Amino acid sequence: MLDWRLASAHFILAVTLTLWSSGKVLSVDVTTTEAFDSGVIDVQSTPTVREEKSATDLTAKLLLLDELVSLENDVIETKKKRSFSGFGSPLDRLSAGSVDHKGKQRKVVDHPKRRFGIPMDRIGRNRLSNSRG
């Protein structure tokens, strides 16, 4: 079954290739293709003018934005900054370190230090001697 499919696929490709090489696959008139080619050339030639115009517009806009940003950076804030961080305070005046994360806070309980008995050696049978040596 697979051999039949492979043979038919090769036959269809061979027929398509022969028709395409003879020019009978697409029934498109030569005048239509010439008109299409000239339209493509016209469309390709106009974007260069449009691209130049848009490039100059973009550079002008970028220069204007750059100037506005530099003017904004030069302005000194006269309003007093709030000393607390919370809801209602402007986001640009909050520092990242002052933001409190709301969540479950666990109480830290100080446990008294556990005192173990007499120190044992590794095996645990004999007491360690207090004398050196």
From Swiss-Prot:
InterPro entries attached to this UniProt entry: Osteocrin
Q: Where does this polypeptide localize?
A: Secreted
From the Swiss-Prot or TrEMBL record, give the protein name. Osteocrin
Whose protein is this, by species?
Homo sapiens (Human)
Q: What induces it?
A: Expression is induced in the developing cerebral cortex in response to neuronal activity in neurons: expression is driven by the presence of a enhancer sequence only present in primates that binds the MEF2 transcription factors.
Q: Does the keyword Electron transport apply?
A: no
Please list the tissues where expression of this protein has been recorded. Answer: Enriched in neocortical regions of the developing cerebral cortex. Not expressed in other compartments of the neocortical wall or in brain regions such as the hippocampus, striatum, mediodorsal nucleus of the thalamus and cerebellum. Also expressed in bone. In developing neonatal rib bone, present at high level in osteoblasts on bone-forming surfaces, in newly incorporated osteocytes and in some late hypertrophic chondrocytes (at protein level). In adult bone, localizes specifically to osteoblasts and young osteocytes at bone-forming sites (at protein level).
Protein keywords: Amidation, Cleavage on pair of basic residues, Developmental protein, Differentiation, Hormone, Secreted, Signal
Per UniProt, subunit arrangement is: Interacts with NPR3.
Biological process per Gene Ontology, one example term: negative regulation of D-glucose import
Q: Which family does it belong to?
A: Belongs to the Osteocrin family.
GO CC annotations, alphabetized: extracellular space
Q: Which residues carry this modification: Arginine amide?
A: R132
What does this chain do? Hormone that acts as a regulator of dendritic growth in the developing cerebral cortex in response to sensory experience. Induced in the brain following membrane depolarization and inhibits dendritic branching in neurons of the developing cortex. Probably acts by binding to natriuretic peptide receptor NPR3/NPR-C, thereby preventing binding between NPR3/NPR-C and natriuretic peptides, leading to increase cGMP production.
Q: Which residues cross the membrane?
A: none
- Which positions carry the signal peptide feature in this UniProt record? 1-27
Q: Per the record's keyword annotation, is Signal included, yes or no?
A: yes
One term of GO molecular function: hormone activity
